[in-house]
């Protein structure tokens, strides 16, 4: 719903025709990337956040009624967008900064406004940091950098590659070759499913139609195609430069630091340790290809909107939309599995779990295990029995704090001070401390221990 509303507003910026806006918004609603992320990484399917950044950039020439609004409304809106971005997923924030870069260029070189872009930068940075602080991002000393930089990048073929599900995209697309009904997947390097930014055959066809139309127009006017391109660039010079810069910056980061075309490595960039540490905070660099993808969407729709004959314009757009629907229909059908009601069956089948959990208000799993199967199994059991749990699955866990807590728990147990209301669950028998009088229960692959005093 939000993707549709925001895309309609975006298209309305350059075409006021309601039918064109509604049909054009379909491309953003059924974006292959959005469909890929649904039911797997839902926060990363909220692409209306990206579209809002693009909207603020394209609407920066909006005429405000009052002078203070002319100066401060855009900084306020950029700041609010920063709050929204970090509240949903931190990866959206650098994408928004890409559009803010475009805003800088057009504000300074086209609209001659030098203060406003800096106020926008200050506002979005300050309010984003404030929101992160309110969410507890600075509560622990966790290392936000993570391994995988260069693995989860985008392939240079990302815009026309529908991918497959045999290892290259970790099964996120469903059945084999279901990214597109018409195009075959192209091999990519392991982990580059994160850089999935297939635009769809409808958009590709739209771009081809625009190219053919431009050639025909040049022939009809007895002018070279290059002359028409120069004329267009002259009228939209600053916007074209800004768009090219935003696209180049986003794509350079998306394919970095190891660039691949298909399975062939093109180049490696060896950054300093400090830069690598910073980039590793956003290790899935391939996601920033989404900025380029939506710029392509918008550019193609803008080109189609320039067709002077209204009926032809709507007809061509509708045709491209039908092709897009047909192309990604396999991807949409692969998501039908999630429409069926699923019954959760806990692997903790032994009735002894219920008896041992009586009177406990917390579950302590030892040692820390990042396995999602273990974490979710124990967490669901704890939730259903109104117990807290000592750790859960998070993106950047504070390993030092977790390790210290582990040693503290083990020391308390060894000293005979086990928490009387805790259900101690060990993942392996070797980690159970030797305490006289302790009773060990092996249940469904786990070891539940009742220590003296419990």
Regions found by a protein language model. Name each.
Residues 2-13, 19-64, 70-107, 121-128, ...:
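Membrane-embedded helix bundles of polyisoprenyl
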Residues 127-214:
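Periplasmic/ER-lumenal interhelical loops and adjacent helix-loop junctions
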Residues 328-454:
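Extracytoplasmic
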Residues 20-40, 130-141, 162-174, 241-281, ...:
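Membrane-interface helix-loop junctions at the exits of transmembrane helices
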Residues 81, 104, 111-135, 146-151, ...:
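Hydrophobic alpha-helical membrane-interfacial segments at the cytosolic entry of transmembrane helices
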Residues 69-73, 109-124, 228-241, 307-319:
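Membrane-interfacial entry segments at the cytosolic side of transmembrane helices
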């Amino acid at each position: 719903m939000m993707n549709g509303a925001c895309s309609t507003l975006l298209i309305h910026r350059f075409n006021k025709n309601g039918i064109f806006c509604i049909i054009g918004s379909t491309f953003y609603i059924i974006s292959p990337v959005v469909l890929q992320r649904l039911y797997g990484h839902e926060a990363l399917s909220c692409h209306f956040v990206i579209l809002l950044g693009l909207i603020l950039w394209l609407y920066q020439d909006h005429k405000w009624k009052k002078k203070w609004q002319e100066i401060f409304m855009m900084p306020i809106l950029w700041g609010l967008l920063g709050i929204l971005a970090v509240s949903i997923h931190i990866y959206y924030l650098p994408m928004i900064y890409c559009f803010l870069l475009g805003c800088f260029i057009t504000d300074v070189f086209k609209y001659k406004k030098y203060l406003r872009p800096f106020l926008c930068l200050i506002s979005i940075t300050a309010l984003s940091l404030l929101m992160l602080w309110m969410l507890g991002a600075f509560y622990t000393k966790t290392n936000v950098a993570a391994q995988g930089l260069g693995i989860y990048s985008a392939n240079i073929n990302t815009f026309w590659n529908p991918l497959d599900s045999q290892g290259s995209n970790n099964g996120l697309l469903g059945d084999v070759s279901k990214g597109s009904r018409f195009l075959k997947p192209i091999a990519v390097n392991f982990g580059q499913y994160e850089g999935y930014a297939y635009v769809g055959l409808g958009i590709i066809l739209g771009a081809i139609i625009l190219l053919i139309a431009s050639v025909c127009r040049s022939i009809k006017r007895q002018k070279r195609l290059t002359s028409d391109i120069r004329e267009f660039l002259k009228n939209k010079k600053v916007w074209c430069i800004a768009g090219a810069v935003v696209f180049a910056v986003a794509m350079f980061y998306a394919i970095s630091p190891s660039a691949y075309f298909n399975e062939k490595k093109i180049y490696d960039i060896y950054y300093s340790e400090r830069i690598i540490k910073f980039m590793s905070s956003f290790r899935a660099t391939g996601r920033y290809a989404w900025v380029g993808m939506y710029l392509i969407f918008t550019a193609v729709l803008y080109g189609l909107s320039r067709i002077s004959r209204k009926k032809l314009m709507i007809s061509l757009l509708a045709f491209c939309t039908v092709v897009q629907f047909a192309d990604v229909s396999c991807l949409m059908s692969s998501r039908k599995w999630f429409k069926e009601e699923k019954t959760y069956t806990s692997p903790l089948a032994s009735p002894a779990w219920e008896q041992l959990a009586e009177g406990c208000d917390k579950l302590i799993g030892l040692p820390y295990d990042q396995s999602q199967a273990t974490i979710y199994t124990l967490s669901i059991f704890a939730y259903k029995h109104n117990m807290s749990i000592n750790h859960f699955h998070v993106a950047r866990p504070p390993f030092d704090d977790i390790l210290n807590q582990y040693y503290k728990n083990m020391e308390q147990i060894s000293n005979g001070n086990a928490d009387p209301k805790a259900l101690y669950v060990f993942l392996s028998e070797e980690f159970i401390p030797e305490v006289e009088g302790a009773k060990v229960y092996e249940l469904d692959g786990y070891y539940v221990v009742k220590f003296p005093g419990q």
